[in-house]
């Protein structure tokens, strides 16, 4: 497919039209816009959630160095920031909703974009939505009387998903306002939690947060690389603004700053929060546990304070489910607009909301909640999302080579260092996940392969009906 860019109005036109390839359209911006502060809130809320409140427990199974554990979050933040700087250039040059689907379609081939969208539909957002809802339920049940029940946890997770699906599928104003309020509360609570825990903990844990003997070997070990997949999942969402580009005010100007500001805020919060977890609670008490935030709060604030904090953290996870229910369906919507055979997914209601896409994503997330385990979703979702963003960041080199004259309102600062750093760290992590967790890695590759098969099957079917 030949994509030609009209530099005056950032429209792209194609010279190819078929029932299964992207339609020959001018990609127009949505008339109704989200404010940049709302989209920044989406970026922050997409990141701050399931991963940071659960990952430390898994990391402590293999790593017991305070310095190395904090370096995990710093390195993961560096990778996310480099990715955000790269996506900022791509998003400013190609300001259409859809994220990786939009970028990979234009840089590589419609098949690459379709597979990216397929990943987003099956894993990219539905999986994290399910994880966040499951974590909400896990934190909520820890403060309830009696033993936690698997049925109760699944019921709470499913109920939350249903409520937020209805909110986001019906009204744009409520959608943006709720997202902004929850994000402000989330950041405020995390900051207050960190300060209060440091002040109130009577006996800090004897953890060394400075480099010590053996830390150098750990930093280059397979254990560190695999632990980074949990961290990369926790940072997943730094690219959320690109899914709403068409609905953003002045995307060429505001998108780069939204991506980088959101990522820097979250990186600071993550390092501080994990420092406090390790400062307050023993490594043995958190190793292998999901509710590390509740465990640390119980040590710092006592039983009553711990339960209250558990409730607050559970409520904050609502914003994570909300953010992904808001951003993810925009990818599905764009695919529906481009592929007539699934055009029903691209339809919007009278308020300009892709209600059909929201319902589809939430339905898949519901299947995950009812049928899968937390860790299995976490590993293969993290692996597949990292692979998706790896291909997108690599695309900046291809796009600069193929379209050197493309209008770029923002150019990646210190190029080519940010994309090279991101590709190196992410590629290293993906390789070690394949070696140490082959089942989850191969499952992720299988999802990608099935997307390719679906694309070419649809192409063949469309060719025979025209």
Where are these regions (language model features)?
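Membrane-interface "cap" regions at the ends of multi-pass membrane proteins
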Residues: 11-67, 80-81, 85, 96-97, ...
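Hydrophobic, membrane-embedded alpha-helices of multi-pass small-molecule transporters
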Residues: 35-53, 160, 197, 214-268, ...
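Hydrophobic transmembrane alpha-helices that form the core helical bundles
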Residues: 81-161, 166-169, 313-334, 370-387
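TM-loop-TM module centered on a large, flexible mid-protein loop between adjacent transmembrane helices
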Residues: 102-103, 109, 142-147, 213-214, ...
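Membrane-interface loop-to-helix entry segments
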Residues: 152-204, 259-263, 382-391, 418-421, ...
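Hydrophobic alpha-helical segments and their helix-loop junctions in multi-pass secondary transporters
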Residues: 184-213, 275-281, 394-406, 434, ...
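C-terminal membrane-solvent junction of multi-pass transporters and transport-like membrane proteins
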Residues: 344-355, 389-440
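A generic transmembrane alpha-helix motif of multi-pass inner-membrane proteins
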Residues: 380, 384, 416-466
């Amino acid at each position: 497919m030949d994509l030609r860019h009209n530099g005056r109005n950032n429209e792209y036109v194609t010279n190819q039209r078929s029932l299964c390839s992207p339609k020959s359209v001018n990609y127009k911006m949505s008339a109704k816009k989200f404010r940049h502060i709302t989209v920044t809130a989406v970026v922050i809320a997409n990141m701050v959630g399931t991963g940071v409140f659960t990952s430390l427990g898994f990391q402590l199974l293999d790593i017991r160095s305070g310095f190395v554990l904090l370096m995990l979050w710093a390195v993961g933040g560096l990778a996310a920031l480099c990715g955000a700087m790269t996506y900022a250039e791509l998003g400013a040059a190609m300001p259409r909703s859809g994220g990786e689907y939009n970028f990979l379609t234009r840089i590589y081939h419609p098949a690459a974009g379709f597979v990216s969208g397929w990943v987003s539909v099956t894993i990219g957002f539905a999986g994290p939505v399910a994880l966040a809802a499951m974590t909400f339920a896990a934190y909520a049940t820890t403060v309830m009387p009696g033993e936690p029940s698997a049925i109760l946890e699944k019921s709470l997770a499913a109920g939350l998903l249903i409520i937020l699906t209805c909110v986001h599928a019906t009204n744009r104003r409520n959608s943006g306002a709720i997202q902004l309020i929850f994000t402000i509360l989330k950041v405020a609570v995390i900051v207050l939690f960190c300060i209060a825990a440091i002040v109130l903990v009577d006996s800090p844990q004897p953890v060394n947060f400075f480099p010590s003997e053996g830390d150098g070997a750990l930093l280059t070990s397979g254990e560190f690389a695999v632990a980074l997949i949990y961290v990369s999942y926790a940072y997943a969402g730094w690219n959320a603004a690109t899914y709403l580009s068409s609905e953003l005010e002045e995307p060429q100007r505001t998108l780069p700053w939204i991506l980088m500001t959101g990522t820097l805020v979250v990186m600071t919060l993550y390092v501080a929060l994990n420092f406090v977890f390790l400062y307050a609670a023993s490594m043995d008490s958190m190793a292998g546990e999901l509710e590390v935030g509740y465990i640390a709060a119980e040590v710092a604030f006592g039983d009553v304070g711990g339960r209250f904090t558990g409730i607050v953290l559970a409520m904050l996870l609502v914003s994570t489910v909300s953010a992904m229910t808001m951003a993810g369906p925009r990818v599905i919507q764009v695919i529906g607009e481009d592929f007539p055979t699934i055009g029903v997914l691209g339809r919007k209601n009278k308020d300009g909301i892709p209600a059909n896409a929201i319902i589809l994503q939430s339905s898949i997330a519901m299947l995950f909640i009812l049928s899968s385990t937390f860790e299995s979703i976490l590993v293969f979702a993290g692996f597949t999302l990292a692979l998706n963003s790896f291909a997108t960041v690599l695309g900046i080199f291809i796009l600069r080579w193929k379209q050197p004259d493309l209008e770029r309102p923002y150019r990646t600062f210190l190029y080519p260092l940010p994309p090279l750093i991101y590709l190196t760290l992410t590629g290293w992590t993906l390789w070690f996940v394949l070696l140490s967790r082959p089942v989850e890695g191969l499952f992720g590759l299988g999802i990608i392969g099935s997307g390719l098969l679906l694309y070419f099957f649809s192409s063949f079917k469309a060719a025979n009906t025209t």
